[in-house]
C-alpha cells in the first residue's frame, strides 16, 4: 500500500523541527534550514508489524534517516528507558531509525535509536552492507518489523538484524537532520519516493 501519492503530503504531518518539506517530481524533498534541530515528516497513522520499502537519494554532505515505530508526546514527558529517566520535550520525535549516512563511515542501513539509546546496530562488522550504498544515486531501503524482530536491507543487501522489545508501534517518519551552526549546509536536500508499506497480521 502506498504511503505517499507522489503528488501531495496528504497523510503526513511535520514534527520537532522546521526544515522544509515539499513534493517535486514524484518525490518528497526535505531541505535543511538554519536554526532548527532535527525535523521529521511523520505519517498520521501508527504501524506495528510491517514491511516498509522506499527509495532515497541524499546529498553527500548530509545525515538523514527513516524513522519507524517512532513516537512523540504532546507535552513534556519523563519516562524510564533502560533504567534511566529521560525527559522528552513536547513534539520531540524519538524511536528506531534506519540510518542514512553518506559519510565515509557508511552506516546506511544501520539502526539508531533516535533521541533515546543511540546505536542499536551499526555496520562496523558488516562490510558488504557498507559497500551497498550508492553515493549520489537512488538507493532502496527495506525495513521488516515482526514483533521484537527488526531487519533492514540496503539495495537488497542485509544490513541490520536485531531483537528489541522497547517499542512495538509508532509512526513512519522522514528525517532532515539539524545542521547546527554549519551555514554552508543550508539548502542541502534529501529525497524519498515510492514509499509503500505492507502491514503484517
Please report, for each region that a protein language model flagged, where it lies by residue.
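Carbohydrate-interacting regions of secretory-pathway proteins
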Residues: 1-201
Amino acid at each position: 500500500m502506498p504511503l505517499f501519492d507522489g503528488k501531495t503530503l496528504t497523510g503526513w504531518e511535520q514534527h520537532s523541527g522546521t526544515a522544509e518539506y515539499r513534493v517535486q517530481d514524484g518525490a518528497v524533498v526535505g531541505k535543511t534550514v538554519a536554526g532548527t534541530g532535527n525535523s521529521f515528516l511523520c505519517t498520521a497513522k501508527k504501524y506495528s508489524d510491517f514491511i516498509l520499502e522506499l527509495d532515497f537519494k541524499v546529498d553527500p554532505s548530509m545525515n538523514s534517516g527513516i524513522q519507524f515505530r517512532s513516537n512523540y508526546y504532546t507535552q513534556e514527558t519523563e519516562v524510564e528507558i533502560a533504567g534511566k529517566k529521560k525527559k522528552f520535550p513536547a513534539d520531540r520525535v524519538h524511536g528506531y531509525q534506519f540510518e542514512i549516512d553518506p559519510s565515509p563511515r557508511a552506516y546506511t542501513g544501520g539502526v539508531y535509536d533516535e533521541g533515546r539509546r543511540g546505536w542499536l546496530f551499526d555496520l562496523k562488522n558488516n562490510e558488504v552492507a557498507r559497500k551497498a550504498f550508492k553515493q549520489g544515486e537512488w538507493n532502496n531501503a527495506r525495513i521488516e518489523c515482526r514483533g521484537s524482530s527488526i531487519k533492514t536491507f540496503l539495495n537488497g543487501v542485509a544490513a541490520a538484524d536485531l531483537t528489541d522489545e522497547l517499542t512495538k508501534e509508532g509512526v513512519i517518519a522522514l528525517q532532515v537532520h539539524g545542521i547546527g551552526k554549519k551555514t554552508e549546509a543550508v539548502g542541502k536536500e534529501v529525497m524519498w519516493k515510492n514509499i509503500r508499506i505492507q502491514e503484517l497480521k
